[in-house]
């Protein structure tokens, strides 16, 4: 069986449909930028001090901004400037970045998820969401970006690790592509990802237990009780601290991920952003048979109120996600 490239896969999906062709071109440019970012990441300490914080600077969400965060955004702006993208919303920029005034889509990105791990050689990545754009319907670019996640045409994430991997969905299942250095192309590795419905593995930053709501504490306590507790089975706990790395593990072998809100200042709604982290992750998760909520409400049903809005996130194996909701 011959290998299927990302371009061939996108061309077959898009056909002659103008909007689909715009989406396909956008995904190709995102993948292109991802390769450039992966090459920078791979140089590690041999390159500039990419893990260095930019003085007292913070991004639009208030997080410390590192050199590679900014460089990754620049790579994406350059690549998407050659795609039919009207506006780009980024974690690193306060307001939408205008690109093609005649663009058919808008894109929201986290240019470099997990950048706190830059210096430790842990997998990091890029998360993206693609939404339809109509100038007459959305003369304000912010309004175009504040569509619910269910309106996404495509979404996905790139992982910069031992392999450079693209996990994406065009609304017809979730696919995994791997970058082949010999041919300089992304090759289809898994055509239909299916997240197992049940799991014995969860991921959460357990050091924050004292700050959690009682519902979150009870769920984790029941998991820790193992086969002798109410769950009747032993659980493993895995936590990388890089959303794309934790997500790819779930897409590979199942599991559930929790980033709840807690009682710390600034953490009432967690730390993840709705439109460029939770929404795209929820989209590819559901397309792979999983589920994604804020603890109780389906992520893709939530109406965004602002571009950098935060949201608690629970996603992964659908039976476990549903079980977690029963605690709230």
Swiss-Prot record:
Q: Which GO terms describe its cellular component?
A: cytosol
One Pfam family this sequence matches: FBPase_C
Q: Which UniProt keywords apply?
A: Carbohydrate metabolism, Cytoplasm, Hydrolase, Magnesium, Metal-binding
> What reaction(s) does this enzyme catalyze?
beta-D-fructose 1,6-bisphosphate + H2O = beta-D-fructose 6-phosphate + phosphate
Residues holding substrate: 113-116, 205, 257-259
Q: Name one GO biological process term.
A: fructose 6-phosphate metabolic process
The enzyme's E.C. designation: 3.1.3.11
Question: Chloroplast as a keyword?
Answer: no
InterPro entries xrefs: FBPase_C_dom, FBPase_class-1, FBPase_N, FBPtase, Fructose_bisphosphatase_AS
Name the enzyme's class.
hydrolase
Query: What does the record note about the cofactor?
Result: Binds 2 magnesium ions per subunit.
- Stored HAMAP family: FBPase_class1
Q: Which NCBIfam families does the annotation name?
A: PRK09293.1-3 (NF006779), PRK09293.1-4 (NF006780)
Q: Please describe the quaternary structure of this protein.
A: Homotetramer.
The name of this protein is Fructose-1,6-bisphosphatase class 1
Q: What organism is the protein native to?
A: Azorhizobium caulinodans (strain ATCC 43989 / DSM 5975 / JCM 20966 / LMG 6465 / NBRC 14845 / NCIMB 13405 / ORS 571)
Classification lineage = Bacteria, Pseudomonadati, Pseudomonadota, Alphaproteobacteria, Hyphomicrobiales
